[in-house]
Design a protein with these regions (language model features):
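Feature captures the catalytic ectodomains and active-site-proximal regions of enzymes
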Residues: 1-205
Length: 205
């Protein structure tokens, strides 16, 4: 009502529809209402008395906390976290290694000193460097994560654990637009791999 930027016309019977809910008191229809996430894995592990450790660099803070915990910011009982500061650079192609190596060292130390039932690690590099569209930096980012994830998998295997390596979406596997030849800077919709690495055979359901 207090808007004075320009004269507005009243349009009768205007049906406003949004893709998602922005504010509960907006008088609009929502195509995809927010779905309450129940029994996220972190909560199930907590209810079973499991110890869990979530780790990422700060650029992906929300992915191992709020998102993974089903839209809950607080930790569940038995959960601990480690956040490694992301580098202060204008764009991550300037430092494609980001903080993967110190993050890895922190998780390796955790593996040595604790007996957690579940460890969650997020590597930001393939996504964040992929968004820059700089091919050479994307290659370096993937090489760094390959090295770091390899060290973690080896340590988990040595401890008799099972490692699951996957992603929530693609990005840096396509750094060049095939049609235009221009840099490709956004997420892809291609299937992602899921590797289960351990000494036993696992029948996934």
């Amino acid at each position: 009502p207090e808007f004075v930027g320009f004269e507005r016309l009243y349009i009768p019977e205007l049906d406003l529809i949004t893709m998602t809910s922005y504010e509960a008191d907006y008088p609009v229809k929502v195509v995809f209402p927010e779905v309450e996430i129940t029994n996220p894995l972190a909560e199930v592990l907590s209810q079973e008395g499991c110890r869990q450790f979530h780790a990422a660099e700060t650029e992906k803070y929300a992915h191992v906390t709020y998102f993974f915990n089903g839209g809950r910011e607080d930790m569940f009982p038995g959960e601990e976290r480690h956040l490694e500061p992301s580098p202060k650079v204008a764009t991550y192609d300037l430092q494609p290694e980001m903080s993967a190596r110190p993050l890895t060292e922190a998780v390796l130390a955790r593996l040595r000193d604790h007996d957690d039932d579940f460890i969650l690690v997020n590597y930001a590099n393939p996504d964040m460097v992929g968004h820059t569209g700089v091919l050479a930096a994307g290659i370096r980012a993937v090489e760094t994560v390959d090295e770091c994830a390899g060290r973690l998998v080896a340590a988990i295997d040595a401890k008799g654990g099972v490692a699951i390596v996957t992603a929530d979406h693609g990005n840096c596997e396509r750094m060049i637009d095939e049609k235009t030849g221009e840099p490709h800077t956004y997420h892809t919709t291609q299937p992602v791999a899921l590797f289960v690495i351990g000494d036993q055979y696992y029948d996934l359901r």
